[in-house]
């Protein structure tokens, strides 16, 4: 089974915060996360923020949700995650009770960031409720693009 087929086989739905936290090993606890949530513009905001942090010399992880292969959506210092590291992460997750797909992908990204020694990681949140599972998330950027802005301003 390939990495992508493993994640594609996972169910939709919601994971408990405790279930996700149980799958985050010690190295993940050292990473500070910045979540990006909202209706539109998440990918651009997350990529810009990660590039800015990396340009300042900070070892930075980036995860964005989407339909590309997961190995392309998890990045460390601007480069796609090492396939070997992602494979080890997928093996560890497959040994546990299955998480829903969005939660499993975010957990895999967090594990990769911890193992790669990232100081900061910018994560696009497919579900803002997943933010509570990640350790050290002092800030969450929220994007809102569209007619909603006219209502509030």
What is the predicted role of each segment?
Residues 1-38, 45, 51, 55-56, ...:
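Short functional linear segments
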Residues 46-47, 153:
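Conserved strand-to-helix beginnings and helix N-cap segments that scaffold or border functional pockets
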Residues 21-29, 52-140, 144-152:
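ATP-dependent carboxylate-amine ligase catalytic core
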Residues 42, 46, 103-106:
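Short alpha-helical patches at coil-to-helix transitions and adjacent helical residues
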Residues 7, 152-153:
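Compositionally biased, intrinsically disordered low-complexity regions enriched in proline and serine
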Residues 36-39, 43-45, 137, 143-146:
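Ser/Thr-glycine-rich phosphate-binding loops at phosphate-binding pockets of nucleotides
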